[in-house]
Protein backbone atom coordinates (compact mmCIF):
# COMPACT_ATOMS: atom_id res chain seq x y z
CA UNK A 1 0.00 0.00 0.00
CA UNK A 2 1.25 3.46 -0.86
CA UNK A 3 1.95 6.07 1.79
CA UNK A 4 -0.67 8.76 2.39
CA UNK A 5 1.77 11.46 1.23
CA UNK A 6 2.38 9.63 -2.06
CA UNK A 7 -1.34 9.25 -2.71
CA UNK A 8 -1.89 12.97 -2.14
CA UNK A 9 1.00 13.72 -4.50
CA UNK A 10 -0.48 11.53 -7.27
CA UNK A 11 -3.90 13.13 -6.94
CA UNK A 12 -2.63 16.69 -7.35
CA UNK A 13 -3.22 18.03 -10.87
CA UNK A 14 -0.04 18.04 -12.93
CA UNK A 15 1.33 21.24 -14.42
CA UNK A 16 1.51 19.63 -17.86
CA UNK A 17 -0.93 17.04 -19.25
CA UNK A 18 1.96 14.92 -20.56
CA UNK A 19 3.16 14.20 -17.02
CA UNK A 20 -0.04 12.35 -16.06
CA UNK A 21 0.11 8.57 -16.03
CA UNK A 22 -2.06 5.68 -14.92
CA UNK A 23 -1.81 4.15 -11.45
CA UNK A 24 -3.73 1.40 -9.72
CA UNK A 25 -6.64 2.78 -7.65
CA UNK A 26 -5.95 0.34 -4.80
CA UNK A 27 -2.18 0.08 -4.39
CA UNK A 28 -0.83 2.90 -6.59
CA UNK A 29 1.31 0.61 -8.75
CA UNK A 30 2.25 2.26 -12.08
CA UNK A 31 3.16 -0.93 -13.97
CA UNK A 32 0.87 -3.69 -15.20
CA UNK A 33 -2.10 -1.28 -15.34
CA UNK A 34 -5.38 -2.56 -16.84
CA UNK A 35 -7.10 0.55 -18.17
CA UNK A 36 -10.62 -0.93 -18.40
CA UNK A 37 -10.71 -1.62 -14.65
CA UNK A 38 -8.29 1.03 -13.36
CA UNK A 39 -6.30 -1.63 -11.50
CA UNK A 40 -2.85 -3.19 -11.70
CA UNK A 41 -2.63 -6.86 -12.69
CA UNK A 42 -2.02 -8.00 -9.12
CA UNK A 43 -5.04 -6.25 -7.60
CA UNK A 44 -7.15 -7.29 -10.59
CA UNK A 45 -6.21 -10.93 -10.06
CA UNK A 46 -6.97 -10.81 -6.33
CA UNK A 47 -10.38 -9.20 -6.83
CA UNK A 48 -11.26 -11.49 -9.75
CA UNK A 49 -10.47 -14.63 -7.72
CA UNK A 50 -12.62 -13.33 -4.84
CA UNK A 51 -15.46 -12.66 -7.32
CA UNK A 52 -15.58 -8.94 -6.54
CA UNK A 53 -15.35 -7.80 -10.18
CA UNK A 54 -18.69 -8.44 -11.92
CA UNK A 55 -18.47 -10.38 -15.18
CA UNK A 56 -14.90 -11.60 -14.64
CA UNK A 57 -13.94 -15.16 -13.88
CA UNK A 58 -10.91 -17.37 -14.34
CA UNK A 59 -10.63 -18.87 -17.81
CA UNK A 60 -10.97 -22.62 -18.21
CA UNK A 61 -10.72 -24.57 -21.47
Swiss-Prot record:
Q: Which GO terms describe its molecular function?
A: rRNA binding; structural constituent of ribosome; zinc ion binding
Output the GO biological process annotations, alphabetical, semicolon-separated.
translation
**SUPFAM superfamilies (UniProt xref):** Glucocorticoid receptor-like (DNA-binding domain) (SSF57716)
Annotated positions binding Zn(2+): 24, 27, 40, 43
Is Chaperone among this UniProt entry's keywords? no
The superkingdom of the source organism is: Bacteria
Q: Name one GO cellular component term.
A: cytoplasm
Here the disulfide bonds are none
Details of cofactor binding: Binds 1 zinc ion per subunit.
> What protein is this chain from?
Small ribosomal subunit protein uS14
Q: Which organism is it from?
A: Dictyoglomus turgidum (strain DSM 6724 / Z-1310)
Amino acid sequence: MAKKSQIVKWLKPKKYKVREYNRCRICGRPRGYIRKFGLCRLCFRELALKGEIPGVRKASW
